Every structure is written in C-alpha cells, then in structure tokens.
Regions:
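A short beta-strand-turn-helix
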Residues: 41-64
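C-type cytochrome heme c attachment motif
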Residues: 70-77, 138
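Short pre-active-site segment immediately N-terminal to redox-active cysteine/selenocysteine motifs
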Residues: 61-63, 67-71, 135
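Thiol/disulfide oxidoreductase modules built on the thioredoxin-like
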Residues: 4, 110-115, 122-173
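N-terminal targeting signals for export/organelle localization
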Residues: 1-44, 176
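Structural microenvironment flanking redox-active thiols in thiol-disulfide oxidoreductases
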Residues: 76-113, 123-129
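Short gly/ser/thr-rich secondary-structure transition/capping motifs
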Residues: 23-25, 44-50, 119-122
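Hydrophobic beta-strand core positions in alpha/beta domains
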Residues: 64-66, 95, 141
C-alpha cells in the first residue's frame, strides 16, 4: 500500500498544477508594469517624422497604446475592430508602429484604415522593450496620471473590447 502512496501524491500535485494552468487566460500574462508609470517615450510621428509625440503630451487623458506592425498577421485580424471602435467609441487610441519600415506602415494604414489619433514609429523596438512587449499586437490602457492600468496581449477581440477595455476606460475617465 505504501509503495502506491508516493506516485499517487505526485500525480495529485501535478494534476493540481495542470488545473491551475488551464484556468489561466493566455492573453492575460501578468505584467510588472501594471500599476506603474508608463515608460517615457519621445518618438517621431509616422505620418510626419519631423514632429514628435511624448508621454508628457498625453498626460491628463486616458489613452490606449496599440503596438502593431505591417508585417504582423494578428494585427490584421484586430485592425477592423480598432477602426470601428475608434469611430463608434471615439477612443484616444495611439499606435506604436513596432520594428517596421515607415513606407510599409503608411501603406498599410492607407489600405486598411487608420484608427489612431496619432501613430508613432519605434523602428528599433526600444520603446517596445521598455513596455515589455512580447510580440505584436499588444494594447495598453494608460490613465490620466500616466500609469499603466491594463495590458492586452494579442489581438483585441470584440469580447475584450466590450467586457474589459470599454468598462475600464469609462471607469478611468470618471476618476479625478
């Protein structure tokens, strides 16, 4: 009887870890940046590279930062939803074009629509690294004080927009 106890105990422990892992949403990878100030950036605008956008320019408003690239297949999946959401919900959505060629990114926005208030260019990917980007697309919600409140990994889905992003944006807009 005792010889079966150890394998049974190991099996139960492994089953518990598996159950915990299966309950987690793969799009909700914990980020050490949640609740911390958004990393500062000063980047050229995609459409007008001689002009720049900084995090300081966005202080005092709730905004979304969508990290995307023209070479990103999943970005193409979420893009129509972002275009529609920007129109219907008047989102303050800023695009961080990640490790991309400017001409490719501009052509992509021309072909598929531009949901962004402004798109900025991170050709070297350094700002993406500061934000802890695993891959594109990723979307961040940043509050009026410049603090990251949420990170969406992967494409924004209609469910994520309806159930998470829009309620959080409304809540943050009401905050002082």
């Amino acid at each position: 009887m005792k010889r079966y106890l150890l394998p049974l105990l190991v099996f139960v422990v492994l089953a518990v870890f598996l159950a915990i892992g299966l309950k987690r949403d793969p799009h909700e990878v914990p980020s050490p940046l949640i609740g911390k100030p958004a990393p500062a950036f000063d980047l050229p605008q995609l459409a007008a590279p001689e002009q720049r956008l900084t995090t300081q320019d966005l202080r005092g408003q709730v905004w979304l930062l969508n990290v995307w690239a023209s070479w990103c297949v999943a970005c193409r999946e979420e893009h129509p939803l972002l275009v529609e959401a920007a129109k219907t919900h008047h989102l303050k959505l800023y695009g961080l074009n990640y490790k991309d060629k400017r001409d490719d990114a501009l052509a992509w926005l021309k072909n598929f629509g531009n949901p962004y208030v402004l798109a900025i260019s991170d050709t070297e990917g350094l700002v993406g690294i500061d934000y802890g980007v695993y891959g594109v697309p990723e979307t961040f919600v940043i509050d009026k004080q410049g603090v990251i409140r949420y990170k969406q990994i992967g494409p924004v889905t209609p469910e994520a927009l309806r159930d998470t992003l829009l309620p959080l944006l409304a809540q943050l807009e009401q905050a002082p």
